[in-house]
């Protein structure tokens, strides 16, 4: 998809990019949204099955012990039943140690609410902004990530991933 943006100053932002894809492709269904600068060592089959079993929009989460790292990601608070209680992008004071990478499953209903979220001021730059807004209209569930993800943020991290990545691990497929 190409929205025609040629500069950082005129880009739509992650949330508006999702809405652009919905509008351009006429999507009226459940959606799996994953940031393109991530590589996974596990299959997404289990995540999709989890979301369908819950019947709600879902996110993934992983435990991050470092508060410094938490200040650079989306941080999610969850109940003992995996319900999202709140989410904040790049908090100065993280309220949990659960990091939420940009892997989202939106139900058809919740995907249709993205434009309403934008209008309500959910934020459009960070992909987690919409989930943060959506979690105020429960339920949204959070599944613990069954493997590792590699975030390719720059050339150095790309080279690191090239050295370390060993493909999707069979034990992480389900």
List the predicted regions and their residue ranges.
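Catalytic-core segments of class I nucleotidyltransferases/pyrophosphorylases
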Residues: 48-52, 83-151, 155-174
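Conserved beta-loop-beta/alpha segment of the NTase-like Rossmann-fold superfamily
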Residues: 1-78
């Amino acid at each position: 998809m190409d929205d025609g943006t040629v500069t950082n100053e005129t880009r739509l932002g992650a949330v508006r990019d999702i809405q652009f894809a919905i509008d351009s492709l006429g999507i009226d269904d459940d959606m799996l949204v994953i940031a393109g600068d991530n590589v996974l060592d596990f299959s997404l089959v289990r995540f999709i099955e989890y979301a369908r079993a819950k019947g709600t929009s879902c996110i993934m989460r992983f435990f991050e012990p470092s508060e410094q790292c938490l200040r650079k990601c989306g941080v999610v608070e969850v109940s003992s039943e995996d319900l999202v209680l709140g989410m904040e992008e790049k908090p100065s004071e993280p309220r949990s140690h659960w990091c939420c990478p940009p892997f989202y499953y939106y139900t058809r209903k919740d995907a249709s609410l993205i434009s309403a979220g934008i209008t309500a001021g959910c934020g459009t730059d960070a992909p987690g902004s919409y989930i943060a807004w959506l979690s105020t209209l429960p339920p949204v569930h959070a599944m613990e990530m069954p493997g590792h993800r590699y975030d390719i943020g720059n050339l150095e991290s790309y080279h690191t991933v090239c050295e370390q990545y060993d493909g999707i691990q069979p034990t992480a497929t389900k």
